[in-house]
Amino acid sequence: MESLRRRDFIRGMSFLSVAAGVKPAAASYDPAAKFGLKVSEVEYRRTKAGRQLMARIYEPAGTGPFPTVLDLHGGAWNAKDRKAEEPMDRAIAESGVLVVAVDLTLAPESPYPACVQDANYAVRWLKTKAASWNGNPAKIGVYGSSSGGHVAELLAMRPRDSRYNAIPLREAPRADASVAYVAMRSPISNTFARYQNAEKLKRSAMIRNNTTFFVPWDTIHESNPQEILDRHETITKVPFLIMQGALDDNVLPAVQERFAQTYRDAGGDIQYRLFEGCEHEWVAQPGPQTDRAREMVKAFIARQVNAS
């Protein structure tokens, strides 16, 4: 009992140190390490409609503190949940990373910016909770897939946007939503270009997913990461990793490459990696390119968290 009280005290002090601007000591991260996992779930908030938004926690079995990553799922803003990227989440967590995958509000229930508000809240919430799962709350990273990558880009570029900060975190009102780095697979980095591609290909489901999410319609431009850069908005620039399938006809490689170059030209640190022979969701299937993606994400995390 005494050891449990001591552990809880240390974890509580870890968050207080972060809130005060003091970074807790963190062990170096070895992406080749192997850990067992404890997987659990908790509710992290409820939507206006009363729907539970759950967080799935992949906690390495070790002492830590481990690097901490928030996973934002894809699904074209209209589908999927925290389990969508489970194979990737497990692969990252088994190397010694606390991975927390969260549900996001879906567009049929509430359009933009609801899911970005969820992500913003989730970062602040995770900063208060990471230590209780042996994670380091001082340097939160993000992994985002497809539309989750779009949310991740907005989250990272606009961490203090009052619209995105709209949901108060009562237990830590001063916590901020800044993140340290973002790794992404097939992010929708140019929302309007993707919509134009859907129209060209006559993909009714993709078109509908856009019209249900971007309400009013001009938000497809306001929330477009490419256009944010083109407008020279004042943004926060954290290191980005973009992994892109060369055969992706959902998010076109040329569009993705343009975003990467624009981010780089704006002074951002970005790695753009093309995966030959791969489509939009190649990481959903086992294979050499999926293994390569997992190793790439882990190496990217290592470079961020082990940097002096």
Model-found features: residue ranges?
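Short beta-strand/loop motif that positions the catalytic acidic residue
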Residues: 242-244
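Short amphipathic alpha-helix adjacent to the substrate-entry channel of hydrolases
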Residues: 83-100
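N-terminal secretory signal peptides and thylakoid transit peptides that target proteins
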Residues: 1-17
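Primarily recognizes the serine-hydrolase "nucleophile elbow" in alpha/beta-hydrolase
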Residues: 124, 128-197
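Alpha/beta-hydrolase active-site loop
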Residues: 111-130
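Mobile cap/lid helix-loop segments that gate and shape the active-site cleft of serine hydrolases
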Residues: 31, 164-165, 169, 193-231
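Short beta-strand element of the alpha/beta-hydrolase
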Residues: 65-74
